Design a protein with these regions (language model features):
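Conserved N-terminal alpha-helical segment that immediately precedes and caps sugar-phosphate-binding
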Residues: 1-110
């Protein structure tokens, strides 16, 4: 297989992966999106969290909500809990690793 065929094969596998993901997760993603919209229409905020690379994805979503994404619009109320390493370290040291996000959500998620 030459380089060109390899690149085409990579694209085909990516398309197959996207189709599988759409079929497996499409309904859940739609429901989550509806919940986010409903929350914001009720004047609530979106709180995102994650560890490792999932924390980066959470932060990316929050950035898109706070800043216009594809169209100019007002900022939407959102915050990422995984960006504050000092708070995460303090909570983990005193309460345990499992409480890092739970403590913050209890305090900020109203």
């Amino acid at each position: 297989m030459d380089q060109s065929e390899h690149v085409v094969d990579l694209f085909h596998r990516h398309i197959e992966s996207c189709m599988y993901t759409m079929e497996a997760l499409g309904e859940g993603i739609a429901k989550a999106s509806e919940g986010i919209v409903e929350s914001m229409l009720s004047e609530n905020k979106v709180i995102c969290c994650g560890e490792g690379t999932q924390g980066l994805i959470a932060q990316h979503l929050v950035t898109n909500l706070l800043n216009h994404y594809q169209h100019e619009r007002p900022a939407l109320p959102a915050m990422a809990l995984s960006t504050d390493s000092a708070t995460a370290t303090a909570i983990a040291a005193q309460s345990g690793y499992n409480d890092i996000f739970a403590n913050q959500i209890r305090a900020l998620g109203h």
